């Protein structure tokens, strides 16, 4: 239902963009299909409706007419009235309010007209001529005017520091340089515009990209919820759209908890959690991510134990060793690699075994009693699933990898829509300690712990 609503909303936005083409403020039709940016081609003279307002009434009139002022990037929406338009006697002590095209006195209600009269506003609309140019249009107006596909202009972009990142389809590539230049011109904080060449399909989660405008500089800096991050965007993975999710998990964990971030990247989870006071073990296989992880830990003046190893090895060594210390602190295991993280779940089965595993139903075993003091382990698994029957799909894959069904009281949180018919979820559940000490799937397995203590 929500996805359908969003798609319908996008269609309406696109349609409004197409309808906007017929408005007086739309860029000239001659720019359609332009592939090399010619800023001078956007110049045109248009007529705007205007109201003559006494200077002493400017503040009150501005509040009253805010919704009717022209919606355009022009230096002034309140201008000096030219003598040839209003007469010499009215140039002093008055200003012209520039209004949206199509505004007439009939646009105003009787109450508004009465209020305007009390403020000394003449009951008359003036035609004000103004020259518009490239600098007066927003980036989406320029792109909608240039590109033959209105949807192309509405797709948007992601910004990572000074880098703007677009995903262009094959039929959009002939326009890539003009798209990049327009974005560079209009987004003041941008210095580099890149287009992704391919999907993320390598083991380090970064992708090939092409600079389509601006500097060939991929080392960037961002601030997310007050924490600073620096990294080479071409060599590591970063997704600004996960900012809310980073903060959600950070808010959830307690200061006394211990966190193992299996696929830590440059630290978007690990660093804010460490800043909170938690003990953090952060790992990433990508040497570049590991390098920037260390850098960002120092940059944020916090502490985290960082590792550059395979996720499976990290769990089998660092997590296992910590659990065997019988620490009383609750443990969280973050697995943010949604494409393949589910394939790592089998590593938890028999994780605590060291040669000799418990026999089935041997609940009196002395070593088993010791295991009862092992801290609670809450896994937060990120996973992609189809929009249709996605919950059933992810439950099936988790069961296949973990070797047992997902606890009924696990929390399945919809993080975001990543593509048409594709969702990203975070599945949070408490691992059975008995399961981590036994390799056989038919051994005794106690009822799962209630997840509500683990996540709200």
From Swiss-Prot:
S-adenosyl-L-methionine binds at residues 246, 284-285, 310-311, 336. PROSITE patterns: SAM_MT_TRM5_TYW2. Its EC number is 2.1.1.228. One of its GO terms (cellular component) is cytoplasm. One of its GO terms (molecular function) is tRNA methyltransferase activity. Monomer. This is tRNA (guanine(37)-N(1))-methyltransferase. It comes from Ciona intestinalis.
């Amino acid at each position: 239902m929500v996805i359908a609503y969003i798609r319908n909303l996008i269609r309406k936005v696109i349609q409004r963009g197409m309808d906007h083409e017929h408005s007086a403020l739309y860029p000239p039709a001659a720019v359609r299909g332009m592939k090399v940016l010619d800023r001078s081609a956007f110049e045109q003279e248009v007529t705007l409706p205007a109201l003559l307002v006494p200077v002493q009434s400017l503040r009150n009139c501005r509040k009253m007419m805010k919704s009717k002022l022209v919606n355009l990037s022009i230096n002034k929406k309140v201008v000096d009235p030219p003598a040839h338009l209003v007469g010499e006697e009215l140039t002093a002590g008055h200003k012209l309010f520039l209004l949206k095209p199509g505004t007439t006195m009939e646009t105003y209600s009787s109450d508004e007209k009465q209020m305007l009269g009390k403020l000394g506003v003449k009951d008359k609309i003036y035609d004000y001529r103004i020259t518009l140019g490239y600098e007066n249009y927003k980036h989406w107006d320029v792109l909608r005017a240039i590109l033959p596909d209105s949807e192309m202009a509405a797709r948007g972009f992601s910004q990572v520091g000074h880098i703007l990142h677009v995903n262009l389809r094959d039929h959009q590539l002939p326009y890539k340089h003009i798209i990049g230049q327009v974005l560079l011109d209009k987004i003041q904080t941008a210095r580099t515009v890149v287009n992704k060449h391919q999907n993320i399909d390598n083991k380090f989660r970064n992708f090939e990209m092409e600079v389509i405008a601006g500097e060939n500089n991929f080392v960037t800096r961002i601030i997310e919820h007050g924490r600073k991050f620096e990294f080479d965007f071409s060599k590591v993975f970063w997704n600004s759209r996960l900012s809310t999710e980073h903060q959600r998990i950070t808010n959830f964990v307690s200061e006394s908890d211990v966190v193992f971030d299996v696929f830590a990247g440059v630290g978007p989870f690990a660093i804010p959690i460490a800043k909170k006071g938690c003990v953090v073990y952060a790992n990433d296989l990508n040497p570049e991510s590991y390098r920037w992880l260390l850098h960002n830990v120092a940059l944020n003046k916090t502490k985290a134990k960082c590792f550059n190893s395979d996720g499976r090895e990290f769990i089998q060594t660092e997590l296992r060793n910590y659990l065997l210390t019988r620490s009383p602190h609750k443990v969280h295991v973050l697995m943010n690699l949604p494409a393949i993280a589910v394939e790592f779940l089998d590593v938890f089965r028999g994780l605590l075994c060291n040669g000799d595993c418990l026999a089935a139903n041997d609940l009196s075993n002395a070593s088993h009693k010791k295991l009862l003091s092992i801290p609670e382990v809450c896994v937060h698994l990120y996973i992609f699933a189809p929009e249709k029957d996605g919950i059933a799909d992810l439950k099936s894959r988790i069961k296949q990898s973990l070797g047992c069904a997902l606890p009924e009281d696990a929390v399945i949180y919809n993080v975001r829509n990543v593509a048409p018919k594709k969702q990203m979820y975070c599945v949070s559940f408490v691992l059975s300690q008995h399961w981590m000490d036994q390799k056989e799937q038919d051994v005794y397995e106690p009822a799962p712990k209630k997840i509500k203590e683990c996540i709200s």
